[in-house]
Amino acid sequence: MMNAFSRRQFLLGGLVLAGTGAVAACTSDPGPAASAPGSSLRPTPTPTALGEPTVRRTLNARPLSLDIGGIEAKTWGYVSDTGDAAIEATAGDVLQVDITNELPESTSIHWHGIALHNAADGVPGMTQDPIEPGESFSYVFEVPHGGTYFYHSHSGLQLDRGLHAPLIVRDPQDAEDQDVEWTIVLDDWVDGIQGTPDDELDKLTGMGSGDHNGKKGMGGHGHMMHGTPDRVLGGDAGDVMYPHYLINGRIPRAHRTFEARPGDKARLRFINAGADTIFKVALGGHRMTVTHTDGFPVQPWETESIYLSMGERVDVEVILDDGIFPLTALAVGKDDRAFAVIRTAGGQAPHPDVDFPELSSTGLLLSSLKPADRALLPEDTPDREVSIDLGGQMMPYEWSILTDGQSSSATVQEGQRLRMVMRNRTMMPHPMHIHGHTWALPGSGGLRKDTVLLRHGETMIADLIADNPGEWAFHCHNAYHMETGMFSSLRYE
């Protein structure tokens, strides 16, 4: 019998140390169980025609001590049978991932962006029972599309404690003509440094109640953030001022260095695994050519900087010059940054606080890209349209999703084309994520995305083909917003 569902069991994953064989992680208390609105608690059964697994991995989720650059954080992480929690596969592979929970509380794994069958989606109380301490669970699923993905816990605030790692799926249709390739994981970090994510949530939810400056319905301000406003996203881009921002698990003063040769063609796969931070990414002295977002190819677009919200991924290519170059990810609205170095020559590395023209350029919003022809969904008129209103405020700290004016799930029938009209009625940006499907954005020529950033006051139209039966989570990928109510689902009738 499946346990009752709790929004605090829906939190997404954290931070990976790509190539180091360890993944940082921690967890918040999943909290008391409470039924999700409209949840059937009956996942669609595992398909019988998956075939034998072609990629097998074993993971243990356990407490560990993480060195983020001369600073030890006692946290939680994934320990892999291969020594590296990152998983690589090829489109069409069948994965079997066996996880044993050595944590003191229940956990789960969600395979972010993968259009897998419902029973493997990793949402406790909706698609599976929680994996209790001492228990094991096997996830078996096909990866149908190539691209940059990641996996993470979907239990409590384990997102902000780092239980996550990259999942890279090779696409036989990609050229794969790069000389070097790096996976770049961006994260915000507090666990084991200044308390825990639960402590941060307690601060937010304990700020008081009622209207603030007459803006209750529009998400009034008054929280912990006092960063410099961003000219594209505004100043209220997050709720938590973290002590550290990381690239591949390292703080700026103990940064990662990526080495190549002058003239090399590099492919960089960026993943924002943060819980509350939108990053603006730039590489000093270079323009980047965007080739994919959220796993799907796009029409190549050259840019100097890119906004990457929580849960989004983007692939870029760049021809590397001769020298030592800063790779900087500004924490938008927080007056801080993550930092690494790309080196193709000897010499002194730049200081982490270095500013450069690309960093101050107008950043690219990924929703403005156009899809490659092979990523397009067939054009058609929607069979059903639902109105999605995003609401909430800081005081009291509460967030919500209303579907057609009700706090209930969106519904669809298999085979239908569903149009979701999302309206952000708050003063904050929200990265909205759909499980089990990938949207096509009509306003961007059919761009394929599973995570879309809605700026304050923005309306975005997103279509999907209902070809994957079950009940699927739909939520804000800001962990603190989802934990306090910005969560719903898409349910097949």
Model-derived segments and spans:
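N-terminal secretory signal peptides
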Residues: 1-5, 16-21
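Sequence-level motif detector for i,i+2 pairs with an aromatic at +2
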Residues: 51-56, 71-73, 104, 179-181, ...
